[in-house]
């Protein structure tokens, strides 16, 4: 099922991006070791590579990916930061996912 593959790839891509950015954040804002930049760089390289695996136009992929990124960021907020999402966080995430689904899976005439 190509839809599940696409969503799964988006989820892994978002995790790579968020993890890489979070590691840089820890170094910059939390005074953690500079060595965190090594896995940070690897994670961000993986993020870019994963984005390149999608078989559709890059602009469409980037637009749709944003919806999945929002959901993953809210999950990160909850799991890593320990902050429970609000109802509005969840509603916004659902709307973002709907947007992703429309962009990626709507019938194409061209």
Swiss-Prot record:
Lipid metabolism among the record's keywords? no
A GO CC annotation given for this chain: plasma membrane
Provide the protein's localization.
Answer: Cell inner membrane
Keywords tagged on the record? Cell inner membrane, Cell membrane, Membrane, Transmembrane, Transmembrane helix
Which InterPro entries does the record match to this protein?
Answer: UPF0060
Q: Report how it sits in the membrane.
A: Multi-pass membrane protein
Annotated transmembrane regions:
7-27, 33-53, 63-83, 87-107
- Which family, according to UniProt? Belongs to the UPF0060 family.
Record protein name field: UPF0060 membrane protein Noc_2955
Native organism is Nitrosococcus oceani (strain ATCC 19707 / BCRC 17464 / JCM 30415 / NCIMB 11848 / C-107)
Q: What is the lineage of its organism?
A: Bacteria, Pseudomonadati, Pseudomonadota, Gammaproteobacteria, Chromatiales
